[in-house]
């Protein structure tokens, strides 16, 4: 199992999916976020945050501070590649080295998946 919170990893993945327009990825990972302890209010907040330049900061009341940092971190990794050193210090102050690597790996891996899904125009299955 992961050392990093599954909820935080899924939040990072959902952030990547929304930022890249990978609807298939979001369709499959939003339920995983909820199953990991996330709330619909947080998903709604994430959708609002995505519309308001989350790489520069997240101000949604639905999120605790750690979740705000995770969304901002995923946004910076996705949009800028480079991450602000102060943001990294905030995360590293609360997460172990292993947790930081797991969170970063999840965000990076799903950036690759998102780009594949969007380029190939893979969309969610019909229900």
Residue positions per predicted region:
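Hydrophobic alpha-helical segments
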Residues: 1-127
């Amino acid at each position: 199992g992961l050392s990093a919170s599954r909820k935080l990893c899924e939040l990072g993945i959902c952030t990547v999916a929304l930022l890249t327009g990978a609807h298939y990825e979001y369709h499959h990972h939003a339920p995983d976020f909820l199953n990991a302890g996330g709330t619909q209010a947080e998903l709604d907040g994430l959708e609002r945050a995505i519309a308001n330049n989350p790489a520069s900061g997240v101000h949604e009341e639905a999120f605790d501070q750690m979740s705000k940092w995770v969304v901002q971190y995923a946004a910076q990794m996705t949009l800028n590649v480079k991450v602000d050193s102060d943001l990294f210090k905030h995360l590293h102050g609360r997460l172990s080295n292993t947790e930081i690597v797991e969170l970063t790996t999840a965000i990076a891996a799903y950036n690759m998946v998102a780009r594949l899904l969007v380029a190939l125009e893979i969309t969610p299955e019909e229900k």
